[in-house]
């Protein structure tokens, strides 16, 4: 009997062992076949997000019954901390949060850097300040797989965002973790709201006001029973041809101000003086038989330059190339977001859009002005024109955009040549401050306009710009100023 029991036990154990081996083998086979397929379909980020969402939902079924009035709110820097671009600011409490902007910036090799990610099930929505890539370039990540996160912004921002994301995907598709389907879902989930309109997202109330930066740009005001947060996004108090000044009177009741600091160390020259200087020097070059290349961002800077030339009835040919025509047509469809739509329409009607290589060849052969992207000469038709025009001392390259470190535009300013392998530039080189960001004095003015301010959080600036501006604010106003790193959480 004992021996029989032993044989039965051993036999049973062997059966269980081989059954387990079979199950493990089957599971391994299924994983080897289906997980790659799922990964291709969702991509790694989406697959992880989907699993995370499922786990979070299960946890939320168990943990519930929060009293919102007892919750502590926080602000977390997911991007834009002591750096320019990659803007991403999370605001919320333990029950959920919203994210203000979700953009990218680029490394030395032009690879996109993405913000930190929050648990997807926790994020109740995104609110977008404007449609520059450093504020919207990462939004589709939260549409991967089963995710359908709502996005809020002005109608102009919505339409321009679609154009910008399509172009980003076309140029950098292999370097980014989403595809066209996620861009499409982003736009399907994008809710347009007007200036002054208030929407509720979970326990927070959100409203938008003109930020004066580009058409559709917004200051974002977030209100709860605990207080008010104002996020400037990119902001400008200077009237330009394209934009009216920011409406900072609408955020005077903020308790916490999250503010950009791109030009925290610098003041901008008088805008009218810049426009006059630019026009006079363009005329000098053209009337001497030369051609002026103006590398400019397709979104806003190109339209600003074209409007300046249109206002003065520039008597020579003007060509514009790149995505600027599509953006211009969008802007003309939303004239309520423009300061001088008449000037932009005049430029659109009278200046020459480059439709192909025949037009491109004609443009650089004529004495006149060419406005072309990209603004930092990192690519686009501007590089073609630069190569054609740079060897002739009669011609000129007039920079009107911010030139980031390690870009060809910055190298031109620092070394006088396009890159380490090029010869010295023979054409005339000038730079003009057509900035659409507030300077040091204006940033201080914004802070002073807020009456019950408890703290200022500086973002979207290099460490030296943030530190310099922080010192000024402390000295002039005496309020607490924080210059956070990415990942830092601030209790409110």
UniProtKB/Swiss-Prot annotation:
Domain of life: Archaea
Swiss-Prot/TrEMBL cofactor(s): Mg(2+)
Residues that hold a divalent metal cation 2 according to the record: 134-135, 234, 460
Keywords, alphabetical: Exonuclease, Hydrolase, Magnesium, Metal-binding, Nuclease, Zinc
Residues reported in the UniProt entry to bind a divalent metal cation 1: 130, 132, 213, 234
UniProt GO molecular function: exonuclease activity; metal ion binding; RNA endonuclease activity
Record-linked InterPro entries: Beta_Casp, MBL, Metallo-B-lactamas, RibonucZ/Hydroxyglut_hydro, RMMBL
Family membership noted in the UniProt record: Belongs to the metallo-beta-lactamase superfamily. RNA-metabolizing metallo-beta-lactamase-like family.
Functional summary from the UniProt entry: A 5'-3' exoribonuclease, more active on 5'-monophosphorylated and 5'-hydroxylated RNA than 5'-tri-phosphorylated RNA; note there is no evidence for accumulation of 5'-monophosphorylated RNA in this organism. Translation initiation factor 2 subunit gamma but not subunit alpha protects 5'-tri-phosphorylated RNA from degradation by this enzyme.
UniProt protein name: RNase aCSPSF2
